[in-house]
């Protein structure tokens, strides 16, 4: 399971020109589920997302988590994070999990965050979405439950 975390001052996601999820300060999360991922990957990544210290403290050091600041999260599924671009000019998606598995683990990840008391807005699974965000920094991190990077 892979995630792109972006520290934002605000973000929202639209489907068919209708806003379906919006947040204030916090994290924008693009989440991709790969074949072989399971509930343990969702739990591990949710814990890391909630606890990663990417917000500045009074001294300007990244020493506070989204939990610490009472921030919000906007989680959007993105199967293209499982793309293999090593050969040719067209990405391959054979590593992406099947839609039913991916949706289940996407929802599990979101539920894990909500169980921690975090406010989580979402996109719509398998929909064509437009994501709008204001990067803060910019500060962006790549997470992988298999620790590839």
Swiss-Prot record:
One of its GO terms (molecular function) is Gly-tRNA(Ala) deacylase activity. Coiled coil: none annotated. It catalyses: glycyl-tRNA(Ala) + H2O = tRNA(Ala) + glycine + H(+); a D-aminoacyl-tRNA + H2O = a tRNA + a D-alpha-amino acid + H(+). A motif (Gly-cisPro motif, important for rejection of L-amino acids) lies at residues 137-138. Its EC number is 3.1.1.96. InterPro entries: Daa-tRNA_deacyls_DTD, DTD-like_sf. It comes from the Bacteria. One of its GO terms (cellular component) is cytoplasm. Keywords: Cytoplasm, Hydrolase, RNA-binding, tRNA-binding. Transmembrane segments: none annotated. Homodimer. Belongs to the DTD family. An aminoacyl-tRNA editing enzyme that deacylates mischarged D-aminoacyl-tRNAs. Also deacylates mischarged glycyl-tRNA(Ala), protecting cells against glycine mischarging by AlaRS. Acts via tRNA-based rather than protein-based catalysis; rejects L-amino acids rather than detecting D-amino acids in the active site. By recycling D-aminoacyl-tRNA to D-amino acids and free tRNA molecules, this enzyme counteracts the toxicity associated with the formation of D-aminoacyl-tRNA entities in vivo and helps enforce protein L-homochirality. This is D-aminoacyl-tRNA deacylase. It comes from Syntrophotalea carbinolica (strain DSM 2380 / NBRC 103641 / GraBd1) (Pelobacter carbinolicus).
């Amino acid at each position: 399971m892979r995630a792109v975390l972006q520290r934002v001052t605000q973000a929202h996601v639209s489907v068919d020109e209708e806003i379906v999820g919006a947040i204030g300060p916090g994290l924008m999360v693009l989440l991709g589920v790969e074949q072989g991922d399971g509930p343990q990957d969702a739990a591990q990544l949710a814990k890391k997302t909630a606890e990663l210290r990417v917000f500045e403290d009074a001294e300007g050091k990244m020493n506070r988590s989204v939990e610490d600041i009472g921030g919000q999260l906007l989680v959007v599924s993105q199967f293209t994070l499982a793309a293999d671009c090593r050969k040719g000019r067209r990405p391959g998606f054979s590593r992406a999990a099947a839609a039913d598995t991916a949706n289940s683990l996407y929802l599990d990840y979101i539920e894990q965050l909500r169980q921690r008391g975090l406010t989580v807005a979402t996109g719509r699974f398998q929909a064509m979405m437009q994501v709008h965000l204001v990067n803060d920094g910019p500060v962006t991190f790549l997470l992988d439950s298999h620790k590839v990077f």
